[in-house]
Every structure is written in C-alpha cells, then in structure tokens.
Amino acid sequence: MNTRDLEAFLAVVETGSIVGASVRLHLTQPGVSRRIQSLEERLGVALLDRQSKPLKPTAAGRETYAQGRRMLRVLDDLKTGLSPKGVVSGEFRLGISPYLSEVGITTLADRLRGSFPDLLLRITTGWPEQLLEQLRRSEIDVAAFCLPDGMHPSTEIEADALDIQPLFVVASQSLDLPSPATLQDLSPFPWIFNQDGCGFRSSIQRRFEQEHLPLRIGIEALSSDLRLSLVARGLGITVATRAAIESSPLRAALQIVPVQDFEPRVRAWIVRRPPVGRLVRPIACLTSALEAVIDEQAPGSNQRDSS
C-alpha cells in the first residue's frame, strides 16, 4: 500500500474536503483525488461518500481511517527510532479544552516547538467528552482538559492527574449579597457559563443538584474575559480562577463571594491511548508545560484583596 495515498485519504477525512487536504499536503486538488482513487482501487471499496458535504468516510472508510492512522503512527515511531539523533518528527495532534487553551495555548505551543522543531503540531479545542471520543477514534494523540474534582476520565485510557484549581464565585459589586452567602442566596441569580460540557459548569451543576436547587443559566459565553465583563455589568454571576479575576481590567467592579460549605474545584488531566511510542517525550514536555501554566493560575501566584 502506498503511504502517500493513505496520507491523502486521512487528510480528506480530517479536513472534510479535497480542497482542505490539498492545502494541508501542498498538492493540487486533482493530485489528491488521484491518490484517493488509487487507494480505493487497491482496496476494492469506496472510502468516501461523495454525496455528503463535507465529505465523510463510508463504513469501510472509517475502518481504513482507524487502521491507517495506526499504521502511519508505527512508521513515524520507526523513523524516530532509526534517526541518528532520535529526532522526533511527524504529527502531534493535541485536543485541549477551551479554558486550558485560553490560559496556556501559546506557552504549550512555544515549549513543544522549541523542544521538537521537526514535530508538526495540530491543535483542536473541545469539551472533555468530545475530546475523549476523538481519542477513542484515534483522531487525536493526547487530550488536556479539566474535570470537577472527584471525577476521573474513562478507565480504558491512560490519564495523568495534574493540580487541583479552586474556583471562586464572582458577582458585580452592585449586587447586594450576604457574606458569606449560601447556595440558596445565589439560586435566584442567573449564571454566566461556558457551553454545556465545561468542567467549571459541571462542578456547579452537580452541587446545585445535590442541594435540590434550580440553576438558572442566563448567558453562555466562551471567553472568561467576556464572562467577567458581563458579570461586572450585573447581568449574572459566574465562577472563575483567582488569577482570571485578579487580572481582569474590570477587577474593581467585581466581588468574590464567599459561599458557605461550597468550594468548587477542578482538576486538569492529560489523557492518551497507549502505546505512545515516539510521542513519549513530547507528551512529557506538554505535561511539564501545562503544570507550569496551572501553577501560574494558583491563588498565591497573583493574589490581591478578595473584595
């Protein structure tokens, strides 16, 4: 089997189009099409549903994708092992949650590119369940995300637990809230969260369910800066890390609300499917860089008065 034909097929599946694959592989569109046709002729099956937009693999195509991705990974491992200096090359596909991406994507990318200049880094964002599913389908090599403290990733994958991060309830200074407040006091207010699937949001939802209290979702906003801006305007309350609160340009308009018997926390995880082969060192580098990013978000790293 021609590995270049296989690479073209994988690129079409991952980009969803001949155009996207041609850009990724630096080939003409007819060149990509010829490679796909060559692979289909060799295997004797149709690999793509050409009526779908974006292009999607057939049942045979999905199996070919999974097997082909593993095959190319083995070849990359072999190349790395035979390299005179052990140079790590090939793709490193990282899936990362929006929060970790927001606070540390540049640090992670810089560290990986500096340590492994021949490694082609591909990064996607998603919520934990999405990333775990992509990991199961071999669409990514490793995932980094946060889960509420006490929750663990699936047992069929390898997972490294990183530091726990405390979260703080944040409201506008204009809101007259008792200090400390109770969850009952907070229940009437709308909450400003990420979309469903966020570890922060899951942590709050679980506790409100335990107390049999309604949780009102007022606004869904992806950026922590935007959420804090909306909170400062009195449009709702949210949770955030200490570092995000203290670094906000609207800090003077925000108050951290102590809440009785409520200390929401999330833990960061690095997860992957064994074996990792040539990616052992890049994953170790990623883990070290992410630990440094999380340390910077710790309460003591940039702490001011909490009111």
Language model regions located:
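Hydrophobic hinge/microswitch elements
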Residues: 127-132, 136-140, 146, 197-255
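Central regulatory/effector-binding core of bacterial HTH transcription factors
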Residues: 89-152
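Flexible hinge/capping segments at coil-to-helix
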Residues: 156-191
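Beta-alpha-beta core module
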Residues: 153-160, 165, 225-275
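A late-sequence structural motif
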Residues: 104, 177, 255-300
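Short helix-boundary/capping micro-motifs
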Residues: 10-28
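A short LG(V/I)-centered, amphipathic sequence patch enriched
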Residues: 40-57
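Alpha-helical linker/hinge and terminal dimerization helices associated
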Residues: 42-43, 64-86
